[in-house]
């Protein structure tokens, strides 16, 4: 079981106490907040990228792949509803290095997407998830 306690800090600000730290949540001044924290929907995209990124990093280590830089760019499109939800999410895995093994890196991404990342499985229940990979030789 996971447990997170989220406490109101006044106005539109909250703090979530997680097992490994605290996350501040707020909205921008244009929405009545102070802009002093993360926005909830952006945190969802960050959780998705972080979950899959941990899988891919672990697999890169196990496969002994040489990667100089690795980042994940995640974009989500929201519905127009009052309670807007993501209906489409694109995740772009970007690898840079001198000796990139593209097939093995794509395998690591696919294993995360199809087998290991629980956050990915949650997103797939409510959004179309598109996966892209990019490789940059340096």
Regions found by a protein language model. Give the residues of each.
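Extended beta-strand/beta-hairpin segments
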Residues: 1-46, 57-138
């Amino acid at each position: 079981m996971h447990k997170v306690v989220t406490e109101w800090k006044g106005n539109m600000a909250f703090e979530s106490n997680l097992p490994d730290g605290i996350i501040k949540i707020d909205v921008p001044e244009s929405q009545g907040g102070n802009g002093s924290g993360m926005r909830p929907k952006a945190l969802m995209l960050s959780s998705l990228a972080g979950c899959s990124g941990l899988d891919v990093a672990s697999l890169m280590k196990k496969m002994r792949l040489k990667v100089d830089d690795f980042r994940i760019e995640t974009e989500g499109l929201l519905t127009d509803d009052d309670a807007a939800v993501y209906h489409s999410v694109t995740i772009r895995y970007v690898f840079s290095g001198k000796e990139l093994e593209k097939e093995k890196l794509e395998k690591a991404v696919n294993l995360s997407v199809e087998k290991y990342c629980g956050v990915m499985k949650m997103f797939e229940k409510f959004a179309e998830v598109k996966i892209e990979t990019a490789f940059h030789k340096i």
